[in-house]
Amino acid sequence: MINLRDEILKNQKTYYNGLIAKHQQNVEIYLNQPVGIGEHSDVMAAIDGEINAIAQAHEKIEIINHYFLVR
């Protein structure tokens, strides 16, 4: 029988890890091809925004691990 609580928490962590991968890839693109991103003339600000998004998703994973997976 599937434990719904554990399944929901696992899926939330998978979702946040996907967001981290997405924003990490965006940073890599900015670092390797900054001239290819026409709508972002301020590459540093764009990278900062991506890193903030990574930090938010990482923090949510840490909250799940600390508050909901410890029994």
What are these regions (language model features)?
Residues 2-71:
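Extended, charge-rich alpha-helical interface modules
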